[in-house]
Amino acid sequence: MKVRTFEGDYRGEGLRIAVVVSRFNDLLTEELLKGALDCFKRHGVEEVHIFRVPGSFEIPITVKKIAKRGYDAILALGVLIKGETRHFELVASQVSRGIAQVSLEEGIPVIFGIVPAEDEIQAISRSGIKSNRGFEYALTTIEMANLFRKLGENNER
């Protein structure tokens, strides 16, 4: 029996990363972006392009537009806070579906860095006070970019 394991690593050298970030809830999304940029810097990523969009709903179409521009991976960042209407559920559902669809159709890792929160306190704690999910999402972005590079180099069955 021949067993081979493929996994990405956290070396950012030579990676070209795109980040699509929502301006809605910008106090929080900016913290996510700071965390992501900190991670990219610490891991040696030299090229990061940031695309700002009005809200999370605009993220999937922007990701689709830039997916063919030679990026190794794309990180989508946003914060959705549940309100008293169904808007939260509708947006969260469509954004997650859209991001997954683009990733599958284009064959590029698109990392879902959208923080869903029940309230503002939870959103704040996930966006930089207790922990910064932006850093974690960026680490996943690096790992997946490297895994896809390895898969592209290996044509074995």
Swiss-Prot record:
It catalyses: (2S)-2-hydroxy-3-oxobutyl phosphate + 5-amino-6-(D-ribitylamino)uracil = 6,7-dimethyl-8-(1-D-ribityl)lumazine + phosphate + 2 H2O + H(+). It is an enzyme of class 2 (transferase). Pathway: Cofactor biosynthesis; riboflavin biosynthesis; riboflavin from 2-hydroxy-3-oxobutyl phosphate and 5-amino-6-(D-ribitylamino)uracil: step 1/2. Coiled coil: none annotated. One of its GO terms (biological process) is riboflavin biosynthetic process. Disulfide bonds: none annotated. GO terms for cellular component: riboflavin synthase complex. CDD domains: Lumazine_synthase-I. Keywords: Riboflavin biosynthesis, Transferase. The active site is at residue 87. (2S)-2-hydroxy-3-oxobutyl phosphate binds at residues 84-85, 126. It holds the Pfam family DMRL_synthase. It comes from the Archaea. GO terms for molecular function: 6,7-dimethyl-8-ribityllumazine synthase activity. NCBIfam families: lumazine-synth (TIGR00114). Catalyzes the formation of 6,7-dimethyl-8-ribityllumazine by condensation of 5-amino-6-(D-ribitylamino)uracil with 3,4-dihydroxy-2-butanone 4-phosphate. This is the penultimate step in the biosynthesis of riboflavin. Belongs to the DMRL synthase family. PANTHER family: 6,7-DIMETHYL-8-RIBITYLLUMAZINE SYNTHASE, 6,7-DIMETHYL-8-RIBITYLLUMAZINE SYNTHASE DMRL SYNTHASE LUMAZINE SYNTHASE. This is 6,7-dimethyl-8-ribityllumazine synthase. It comes from Pyrococcus furiosus (strain ATCC 43587 / DSM 3638 / JCM 8422 / Vc1).
